[in-house]
Amino acid sequence: MTDANGAPAEAAPQIRMQVLAQYVRDMSFENMVAQKGLQGGDVQPDIQVQVSLDARKRSVEHQYEVITKFKVTSKNKSGAAETLFLMELDYGGIFHVENVPEEQMHPFLLIECPRLLFPFVRRIISDVTRDGGFPPLNIDTVDFLALYRMELARRAEAQKAAQPVQ
């Protein structure tokens, strides 16, 4: 390609991303059924999954830490809507990211990085629920782009509400 003067146009540098580490930062699983001595007879689980994300720059150049936080609650739809189990998982990754424009870094970290971590999160949740005495829970795929957009809209509303009316 050439620019308007006929000189070769410089190609944008290719984005480079490398996963340096993945880890469970924090995890808990509470089996309320076993704790309360409930029978597993008439159980109709209602699963709710809450997801939040966090990212921060590390002291090493081009390195970022991304944390995905999942809170999974299962309640019994029939009867008194008792909680069957509660699982909380903070799963992190350390990423080396280069050649992403500064204005695109925030969405890149909160959309693309969690997308890479998600299969591992799903597997951990499935294994832990199975090991906790329940059928394995394979949570639905998370649309991290939609989640990012919802968070931006929420922040814009909060900022708008915080401004004094004149």
From Swiss-Prot:
- GO cellular component terms given for this protein: cytoplasm
Subcellular locations according to the entry: Cytoplasm
Checking InterPro entries in the record gives:
SecB, SecB-like_sf
One Pfam annotation, family name?
A: SecB
**Which GO molecular function, any one, fits this protein according to its record?**
unfolded protein binding
Task: Read off the Gene3D superfamilies from this record.
Answer: SecB-like
**Any keyword Chaperone?**
yes
Using the UniProt record, give the first listed, main subcellular location.
cytoplasm
Q: Which UniProt keywords apply?
A: Chaperone, Cytoplasm, Protein transport, Translocation, Transport
Instruction: Cite a single GO BP annotation.
Output: protein tetramerization
Subunit and partners: Homotetramer, a dimer of dimers. One homotetramer interacts with 1 SecA dimer.
Function statement: One of the proteins required for the normal export of preproteins out of the cell cytoplasm. It is a molecular chaperone that binds to a subset of precursor proteins, maintaining them in a translocation-competent state. It also specifically binds to its receptor SecA.
| PANTHER family assigned to the protein according to its UniProt record, in alphabetical order | PROTEIN-EXPORT PROTEIN SECB, PTHR36918
Q: Which family does it belong to?
A: Belongs to the SecB family.
User: What name goes with this protein?
Assistant: Protein-export protein SecB
